[in-house]
Amino acid sequence: MEGVELKEEWQDEDFPIPLPEDDSIEADILAITGPEDQPGSLEVNGNKVRKKLMAPDISLTLDPSDGSVLSDDLDESGEIDLDGLDTPSENSNEFEWEDDLPKPKTTEVIRKGSITEYTAAEEKEDGRRWRMFRIGEQDHRVDMKAIEPYKKVISHGGYYGDGLNAIVVFAVCFMPESSQPNYRYLMDNLFKYVIGTLELLVAENYMIVYLNGATTRRKMPSLGWLRKCYQQIDRRLRKNLKSLIIVHPSWFIRTLLAVTRPFISSKFSQKIRYVFNLAELAELVPMEYVGIPECIKQVDQELNGKQDEPKNEQ
């Protein structure tokens, strides 16, 4: 029996005979109602009313004889007035809630969600502010804008002897004063800058010319800072350092080195040398590319003048 789904409750002993076929049931219904009772176009008081479509009984089978949606009842599309059908319009109230929502203006959306444009000038300025230096096996960022006034603290003084034996000039007079509100931040970035620059300047052996003149106590780096610099220097750089020349050594720096001598290796202590004027420095180092600040030259003239006065009196 096609098109009929039998359920368990139907298979009962109360049904002594088999259920009738679907075709006989449909024929009985048509005989009772008659074809004139089928829905069609009606006229009331001579006025044509809209035709109402009766929903057919939908069967879950695909058999055309069951009155499913595939039956011939819906094939009579020619008798239906499509213009007269009451269909929902495009502006139906079903979606009116969307229109009631406040719609922000395009400019407002752009203003709230937009990101400030990064101009080429700002990108260039940001690139100048931050610079990467490699110290040992790690890369460190240095705030170049913060240390801009103090970058002259380290410079390249040319070469000496044969080969690429570099002369590195360290001018303490360009150090920041300890009274600066951001002194620790400055010294931290300056430390990275000095060590990173030293890595770039040195290829083989090198010497450091430490210009100590014209330096107040406020600009003197602490012992911990100097020790940190020495400890952070790569082993290759510590080994290749041939000489540390201190020009115009003050009583403070000489006392400091004397106190720390027991904690410094004997090899490093042998590399330290004091020079009391620029003329003596010129005998040890080629001065062609060594940049001497004006304040150092002025201090040197004052010190040499005081030393020459007793000789002139004699």
Swiss-Prot record:
Cytoplasm in keyword set: yes
PROSITE patterns in the record: CRAL_TRIO
GO MF, any single term: calcium ion binding
Positions of modified residues (Phosphothreonine): T87
Region called Disordered, residue ranges: 1-21, 76-100
Segments forming domain CRAL-TRIO: 147-304
Main location: cytoplasm
Entry coiled-coil feature ranges: none
Record keywords, A-Z: Apoptosis, Cytoplasm, Phosphoprotein
Biological process per Gene Ontology, one example term: positive regulation of neuron differentiation
Subcellular location: Cytoplasm; Cytoplasm, Perinuclear region
Transmembrane segments: none
Any one Gene Ontology cellular component term annotated for this protein: perinuclear region of cytoplasm
Segments of skewed composition (Acidic residues): 10-21
Function: Implicated in the suppression of cell death. Interacts with the BCL-2 and adenovirus E1B 19 kDa proteins.
Protein name according to UniProt: BCL2/adenovirus E1B 19 kDa protein-interacting protein 2
Source organism: Homo sapiens
